[in-house]
Every structure is written in structure tokens, then in C-alpha cells.
Amino acid sequence: MSGRFTYRLLEQKDIPQAASLYNMSCESGEVVYSPLSEEAFAGAFLQPGMTAFAAMEGEKLCGFVHGTQKVIFLPGETHENTPGYLTVIFVDKACRGQKAGTRLAELLMDAFRHSGKKSAACSEQNPLHLTWRIPGTPGHDHNKAPGVDENCAGYPFLQKLGFETAHHEIAMYMDLKDYAWPDSMTLLRQKLSNEGVCTGRYDPRLGYEFDGMCDRIPSEYWRHVLQTETKAWLEGKPNSDPDLWPDGIRPSGPRPILAATYDDHIVGFTGPVDKQRSGRGWFTGICVDPNFGRRSIGEVLFHLLMQEFADEGAAFTTLFTGADNHARRIYERAGLRVVCTFAMMSKTL
């Protein structure tokens, strides 16, 4: 009990009220997220590894908080060395100013501590991916948020709770009808080819080595993507990892892989080439072997990906990158623009 509210775990019976509160905040522009049906809300917010608390006034739900914990780990990750993830806090307008949001956050932090977590975070590593809408577009969206929208009320609220901003991420957008392959990329691809670096679609039957690149970056994520995508090609099946499926929908089969190769090594990678139901070209990132840096390999791969998206009929693409990341210049030269800024935040428990 705290003032006028009681607090308890969010339950299935609360879904209609919780989804309504969530959707009202989405539709009023308080948050950038896309509205969800009650069924989609329940499917997203009530999964294994998730914790949610409700603030109640009698039978009325006045607010809720939601958090997650990883249940699938990359090499080197454990339950103990990964944070608990704060997903969202919502409080009904009529119930604000009564410390309900603060108490909900405290309950979630206590739950994280009890489960052995040493920190809490708001970042793109959250297993729950919430779609958000690109401002000023005809309903174009992105499949997950990389942190806290710095324009929403939640950002200063979390700062007051002791969350610190570890990193600023910018979300970038391009309508693909505006994309045009630049002649300079044709010349650059030829220059790289003359140096022994081939760029374009990669044939996994070649069996080129990529562990060296992943070790030097270093990135277990990219190792996993390359392992699963090349395996899918060799077996003639779709990628088996649901985390690598756009919209959670199993691909129809192996997908094109774009890579830069040198001798029998993969030294750069982007892809796989795919698109979401919304028409978004599904951008997962670009990696380049540090031993092959400063040769514009990443820029060539990015333009190849944009051309593949356009050829596949994608309507637009979005991505996020560090506000100070030099890759931002690559994306801006290709025609993308900044549409939102997010903060990756963390708090020691």
C-alpha cells in the first residue's frame, strides 16, 4: 500500500485496462510506440522471463511497469552478468503526481535484485521488441527501440530515479523511392576488387572463414548471425533462430547474404536481405574486420544493401547508430536523416 494505490503483479485479467492505457499514450503522442491489440499486448508483455507490476485503485488499473530478463544467452553472457531490462512505465493521467510511477519502478528494481541482477538497463538488448512509429511518415515504423526516447516524459523521470545515460542513439530513416545508386560506389567497388576485396552476394558453399573477423571486432552477435545464415543456406532451410526473423515470422527459405571477401576470408558483412510486413527493409547492421578498416568497405556494403532493398520492393528503411558514430556520415550520404534520439540508460542495483 502507498497512499491511494495498492500494488501487485500484473495479471491476465488486467490486460484490457493495461492495453488501453498503453494505447492511449501511443495515440496521444506521449510515446512513439505503435498501438497494440489486447491479444498482441498479452503476447508481448506476458512471456517467460518477464515481470510486471500494476498500481490499482480498487478495480481500476492506474499504472503498470514492465521488465524483462534474458533467458537465451550469447557466449560469455550469464544471468548474473546481464542486467534486468526496464521496458516501460505507464501511469494514467488522472493518477499522476501520487508517486505511483516511482513505486512501480522500485518494485521492479527489487524484483531484479531478488533474481540476482546487479544492474538495470533500458537498451536495445531488451528481449522484448516494441515497434515504434517514425514521426512525419505515412505509418512507417521500426521493429524495436534502442533505449528511451529523449523527447518523452520518461527520460527525465528515469534520471530522477538514478538511471544514467550511457550512450545516445539516433534513429535514421529513408524512403527508398528516394534512393539512387551513386556512380562513386561503382568506382569504389572496382578499386576494392583491384585490391583483392570482392563485394556483393556471398555463396556460402565457398565456406570462407569469418571467425577471425568476429574475434577482432569482437562480436559474438555477428558470429551467430553468420553461423546461422550460412547453415541455413547449406541445409536449404530458413534460419532457425526466431530472433533473426522479421516480425517473428519464419522466412520462406535462405536469404541473400551480402559480404566483402578477401582470399578465403569474410572481412565484411551485412544482411541478411529481408523485409518486414510494413515494407521496411530489415537492416540488422554492418560489420567490417578491423584489419580492413578505412577502405570504405562498410559504405559499399551499405549501398549494396539499399539497392537490394529497393529491388526487393521495400518501401523504406530505418536504423539506429551512435550519435557520434562515424558510420552516421555513411548513412547520411546515402540519404538517411535523423528522426529520433534515444538514450541507452543503466542503473546499479
What are these regions (language model features)?
Residues 105-196, 343-347:
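Acyl-donor-binding surface of acyltransferase catalytic domains
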Residues 50, 115-117, 314:
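Short, high-confidence coil segments that cap the C-terminus of an alpha-helix
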Residues 71-86, 96, 115-120, 274-283, ...:
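A conserved beta-turn-beta hairpin within the catalytic core of GNAT-like acetyltransferases
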Residues 302, 324-327:
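Short glycine/proline-centered loop/turn elements that form peptide/ligand docking sites
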Residues 91, 97-110, 288, 294-307, ...:
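Conserved acetyl-CoA-binding loop-helix of GNAT-fold acetyltransferases
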Residues 1-43, 48, 52-56, 61, ...:
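Short amphipathic alpha-helix that is part of the acyltransferase structural core
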Residues 23-52, 57, 65-81, 222-287:
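A conserved beta-strand-loop-helix scaffold within acyl/acetyltransferase catalytic domains
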Residues 63, 167-170, 268, 340:
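A structural microfeature
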